[in-house]
Amino acid sequence: MYGYGYTPAVVAPTVMSFSFVPPQAFQQCWFYSLYTQIQQAQLYEMQSWFMRVDANRSGTISSGELQYLNIGGTPLGIETATKLIKVFDHNKNGQIDFYEYAALHQFINNLYRCFVANDRNFSGTIDANEIYNALITSGFQLPFPTVNYLFLKLSPSGYGLLFTQFLNLCATVALTRSLFEWNDPMRTGVVHLNLAQLYDIIALV
């Protein structure tokens, strides 16, 4: 697990009232497979972090709270946090519960492993070709021209992306996937959108 951390005001730990078995609706989401990869010991660690952040005991956290998640000593930031909230917020209430957070956390862990594996020259950055390979490893099959376009949006000069930038790119891809699935409840692989719905998707991404 990459160096995550969060240091809000200390809140006395309490036992959360839910089990680690997520609701049925959550199990229908593409990111449920991420949740199933997590060992129970890791779930307890994630639960502890979640409880510290959820200071008002609402059972959910917002992008304003998630932005302080540290990645190698660097906070996630509000832009990426907001995008990730949208990816994993399957009930679209603008916040994420513990199950959604755990899947999000595993998503970041997996992406970091892919980033390291594809940073073959140990520069701390990866280029468009390496990003293309990392996305395939992460389960996202995108044409290379699309990957290159996303890469140049974040790095117009063509310089390699840092992990936080790579995570932002992957969050965009994952959000697009979530928005597609929400409009494809029968999982046919095809969606029919009117212009207003397309505008909504563009606004969210």
From Swiss-Prot:
Coiled coil: none annotated. Ca(2+) 2 binds at D89, N91, N93, Q95, E100. Its main location: cytoplasm. It holds the Pfam family EF-hand_7. It is a peripheral membrane protein. Transmembrane segments: none annotated. InterPro entries: EF-hand-dom_pair, EF_Hand_1_Ca_BS, EF_hand_dom, Peflin/Sorcin_CaBP. Disruption phenotype: Cells lacking pefB and mutants lacking both pefA and pefB grow normally in axenic medium or on bacterial lawns, and have no major differentiation defect, apart from the fact that mutants lacking pefB have a stalk base thicker than normal. GO terms for cellular component: cytoplasm; membrane; nucleus. It is found in: Cytoplasm; Membrane. Ca(2+) 1 binds at D54, N56, S58, T60, E65. GO terms for molecular function: calcium ion binding; calcium-dependent protein binding. Keywords: Calcium, Cytoplasm, Membrane, Metal-binding, Repeat. Gene3D superfamilies: EF-hand (1.10.238.10). It comes from the Eukaryota. Residues 45-75, 76-111, 119-141 form the EF-hand domain. One of its GO terms (biological process) is sorocarp development. In contrast to pefA, does not form homodimers in presence of Ca(2+). May form heterodimers with pefA. Belongs to the Peflin/Sorcin family. This is Penta-EF hand domain-containing protein 2.
